[in-house]
């Protein structure tokens, strides 16, 4: 991973690239965080997650989470840092759940609940954070539950309505850690 600011690039249906699209908010260009690691579009919004250059300096402008209009690239919200005991949680991925008016932001300190109405940090999912050398990454939503891959703990299964950790499936017996999760067309869930 580099030390450059993250950028957004667009590939149109004709195969033409547009590089370093600016995101503007209140007449100013928003700088994304260092090393973009995830972006997703849901409805009209794009959610962009970036790592931080230095998690021990949470007040330095280095946004973890940026929301913009997916067509116009007009910024809607910026969360610079989610402060923790050691500085800041480093962003990994975002799962919007518009029917619940919230989304989950996975980080190096577990999973945080983000309001989709005002983009504030509502809470942290208890039991998902506080581990050394930890990172929670990709997540999927299905049947009222969120399945979140965690490098240290395995798979978190979270009640998405009540924001409660229901179960952790540990993968130590397999001799490795999970890295990602996907849902196939037939609805089956796969871990790698």
Predicted features along the sequence, with ranges:
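WD40 beta-propeller blade core
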Residues: 9, 66, 112, 156-157
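Mid-chain, structured segments of secreted extracytoplasmic proteins
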Residues: 33-60
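Conserved beta-propeller blade signature
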Residues: 1, 45-48, 102-105, 112, ...
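Repeated scaffold domains used in trafficking and secretory/extracellular systems
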Residues: 29-41, 83-100, 130-143, 174-187
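Short glycine/acidic-enriched loop and turn motifs that connect beta-strands
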Residues: 1-5, 52-59, 110-112, 153-154
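A short beta-strand motif characteristic of beta-propeller blades
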Residues: 16-32, 37, 74-86, 120-131, ...
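Short loop/turn segments that connect beta-strands within beta-propeller blades
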Residues: 12-15, 69-73, 115-120, 159-164
């Amino acid at each position: 991973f580099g030390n450059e600011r993250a950028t957004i690039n667009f590939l149109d249906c004709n195969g033409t690239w547009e590089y370093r699209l600016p995101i503007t908010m209140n007449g100013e260009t928003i700088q994304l965080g260092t090393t973009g690691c995830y972006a997703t579009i849901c409805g009209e919004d794009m959610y962009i997650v970036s790592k931080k250059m230095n998690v021990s300096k949470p007040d330095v402008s280095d946004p973890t989470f940026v929301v913009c209009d997916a067509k116009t690239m007009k910024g809607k919200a910026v969360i610079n840092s989610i402060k923790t005991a050691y500085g800041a949680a480093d962003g990994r991925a975002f799962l919007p759940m518009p029917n619940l008016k919230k989304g989950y932001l996975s980080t190096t300190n577990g999973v945080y609940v983000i309001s989709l109405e005002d983009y504030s940090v509502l809470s942290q999912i208890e039991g998902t954070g506080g581990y050394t050398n930890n990172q929670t990454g990709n997540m999927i939503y299905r049947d009222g539950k969120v399945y979140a891959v965690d490098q240290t703990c395995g798979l978190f299964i979270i009640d998405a309505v009540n924001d409660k950790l229901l179960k952790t499936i540990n993968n130590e017996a397999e001799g490795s850690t999970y890295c990602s999760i996907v849902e196939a067309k037939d609805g089956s869930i796969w871990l790698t």
